[in-house]
């Protein structure tokens, strides 16, 4: 059986990267929450 996680740097950046987060309202909210919490790394 194939494992579910097949790492790809491109897919990772495109779905969870900073620009991907900034492109949607929900993504902007995610970043805002992470900044408010004080996360050192807000995106991948």
UniProtKB/Swiss-Prot annotation:
<dbReference type="Pfam" id="PF00468">
    <property type="entry name" value="Ribosomal_L34"/>
</dbReference>
<keyword id="KW-0687">Ribonucleoprotein</keyword>
<keyword id="KW-0689">Ribosomal protein</keyword>
<protein>
    <recommendedName>
        <fullName>Large ribosomal subunit protein bL34</fullName>
    </recommendedName>
</protein>
<comment type="similarity">
    <text>Belongs to the bacterial ribosomal protein bL34 family.</text>
</comment>
<dbReference type="GO" id="GO:0003735">
    <property type="term" value="F:structural constituent of ribosome"/>
</dbReference>
<dbReference type="GO" id="GO:0006412">
    <property type="term" value="P:translation"/>
</dbReference>
<dbReference type="InterPro" id="IPR000271">
    <property type="entry name" value="Ribosomal_bL34"/>
</dbReference>
<dbReference type="InterPro" id="IPR020939">
    <property type="entry name" value="Ribosomal_bL34_CS"/>
</dbReference>
<dbReference type="GO" id="GO:0005840">
    <property type="term" value="C:ribosome"/>
</dbReference>
<dbReference type="GO" id="GO:1990904">
    <property type="term" value="C:ribonucleoprotein complex"/>
</dbReference>
């Amino acid at each position: 059986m194939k494992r579910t996680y097949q790492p790809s740097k491109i897919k990772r950046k495109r779905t969870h990267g900073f620009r991907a987060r900034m492109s949607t309202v929900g993504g902007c909210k995610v970043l805002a929450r992470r900044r408010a919490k004080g996360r050192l790394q807000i995106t991948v």
